[in-house]
Amino acid sequence: MHGLLLAAGLLSLPLHVLAHPQPGTSLAGRAVDLNAYRMADRASYMSSDEMQAQQPHIASVSAGGYVETATEVVKRVMPGMTFRLVDDHYVGVSGISHVYFRQTMHGMDIDNSDFNVNIGKDGKVLSYGNSFYTGPAPDKAPMVKRDFSDPMQALHGVRKALNLPITADKATVKTVNEHEVTFMGTTGALSDPSAKLCYMAKEDGSLALTWRVETDMGDNWLLSYVDAKSTDQVHNVVDYVSHATYQVYRWPIPDPTEGKREILENPWNLRTSPFTWISDGKNNYTTTRGNNAIAQANPDGGNEYLNNYRPNNKNLKFEYPYSPNMSPPKTYIDASITQLFYSANMVHDLYYMLGFTEKAGNFQVNNRGQGGKGNDFVILNAQDGSGTNNANFATPPDGQPGRMRVYIWTKAQPARDSSFEAGTVIHEYTHGLSNRLCGGPANSACLNGLESGGMGEGWGDFFATAIRLKPNDNRNANYVHGEWVNNSPKGNRLFPYSTSLKTNPLVYTSCNKYNEVHAIGTVWASILYEVLWNLIDKHGKNDGPTPVFENGVPKDGKYLSLKLVLDGMAIQPCKPNFVQARNAIIDADKNLTKGANKCELWKAFAKRGLGTGAKYDPKNRTGSTAVPKECQ
């Protein structure tokens, strides 16, 4: 290989590990601030209305099938650029075709340069997102110049810069292909680290040749972009972690203070889980394992899970004692695992109905020939011993299992187990949803910027809040996130979610004073909470556990809001900002209902400063309460 040792076992694209409610983004136990390494949000988004007004020649493109049409759009918008089709395009349940492209240079990826095209169910171009690099190209291919470091130096550079407890003194480098290697014989990571030679578009408009080093450290699953010439310089870091009969708290009881446990028989939905929750179509289980998830205890916080303890009952009676007063937590581990398994499967089934299917990159072992990549249920670790007072979800690309770690919270006595707080489980699972939808199932690195990462947190809060609405709630209802596990009426967010600007004063420009994803996420979820109630006021509220559809459209406002937000995730560009995500939701409604809710959406966004005149600038966002003329 021309003197370069490169390896076997393809390096997967970014996995997102997102932590639940605790502010601050740092490497677990190592005092390194990952915010300093976040990628800039570089994408542009051309909405349906903008394209009709500014680029009618693009809106009218038609070149046969949806992939061919999308390819032609990229060629016309970015003439002369080289790119490749990412093999994860699909037609969603709303009829929108999603096609994804990655920019290339000298035969190598520019790893943060993406283009996504959305084709409406009418076959016309709906919108597109673009973050292609437009600066000067290197004069020679790096594989010709050989002007880059050994990959082992890159691993050492990452280890030093991020203070990773990886030992590589006896490691060897195994070649995967001309651009990729795997490091064999290291210790300290949960799996063998790997590296891929690729370009990175920098914030200053230049292009850097980098080694993308992947290290799974458990609570952090990192893609570190190390300068290929000076391996002591780390340009950016992506973290994938963000951060029968069942006796359970019935969905969607939020926590043990608001309901009693019940014994539910066969709680699955055969339309969304046709093998039930305890079979994968080939094997039937008598434990908390099935096609969608596998749940177990993980007291030592390790990476192994298949042989970990989980309750087993040949009669399929998962009925175990639990009371919030029980202590220590291990005395009720069976109940904890069962509750976590139940809640995660309920989320799977609901999100499937809303459009998070096999083609869209959902989490299942057996995809039944429905598209996407299988063998990727969610690994659910109850009472995970790797931390306390938190939870996180790791989202690798489609075809690799997601991993949810749920911790014990020590802010009350006795300590509280977050498996029993539905909002925690919904929030974490929603990281998997947003990371698989945004940018396509094969790209899990689209929500690692400050504003895009903040929206990832906000979507988690929004879905958790909307799903937990009570039958008697109206737009005056306020919701606190993380109240029970935190043992605090204020929870762990800046303000309660509320339609009152006195109770919750957050507006779009509030983001100007925040530099942390949970704070920015609270702003985004506060805006979406306005969307929720505007649509409920117009269409009513379905208090059942599943939506009722008419011609593919939820009939009530609660589930319609979830559907539009979910569709918007798939439409928006990789690394979106608030303005682009707003436009994607409006485009989702245009596709789904022909824009029947345009004014309700605009009024909700405008109320909190995301009106027609809102502008994104990472340091000085401009707010607006204006709405389109037809909505005044």
Curated annotation (Swiss-Prot):
- Provide the propeptide boundaries: 21-244
Purpose of the protein: Secreted metalloproteinase probably acting as a virulence factor.
Homology family: Belongs to the peptidase M36 family.
Question: What does the note accompanying the cofactor annotation read?
Answer: Binds 1 zinc ion per subunit.
- SUPFAM superfamilies listed in its UniProt record: Metalloproteases ('zincins'), catalytic domain
Q: What lineage is this protein's organism placed in?
A: Eukaryota, Fungi, Dikarya, Ascomycota, Pezizomycotina
Q: Which GO terms describe its biological process?
A: proteolysis
What is one term from the GO cellular component aspect held by the record? Answer: extracellular region
Query: Could you say which EC number(s) this protein's record lists?
Result: 3.4.24.-
Q: Where do transmembrane segments lie in this chain?
A: none
Q: Which UniProt keywords apply?
A: Glycoprotein, Hydrolase, Metal-binding, Metalloprotease, Protease, Secreted, Signal, Virulence, Zinc, Zymogen
| Name of this chain's protein | Extracellular metalloproteinase 5
What residue range is the signal peptide? 1-20
Report the subcellular localization.
Secreted
The terms under GO molecular function for this entry are: metalloendopeptidase activity; zinc ion binding
Catalytic residue positions: E428
Q: Which domain of life is it from?
A: Eukaryota
Q: Which PROSITE patterns match?
A: ZINC_PROTEASE (PS00142)
Q: Which residues are glycosylated?
A: N284, N591, N620
Q: What is the required cofactor set for this protein?
A: Zn(2+)
Q: Which organism is it from?
A: Arthroderma otae (strain ATCC MYA-4605 / CBS 113480)
InterPro entries linked: FTP_domain (IPR011096), Fungal_virulence_M36 (IPR050371), Peptidase_M36 (IPR001842), Peptidase_M4/M1_CTD_sf (IPR027268)
At which positions is Zn(2+) bound?
H427, H431
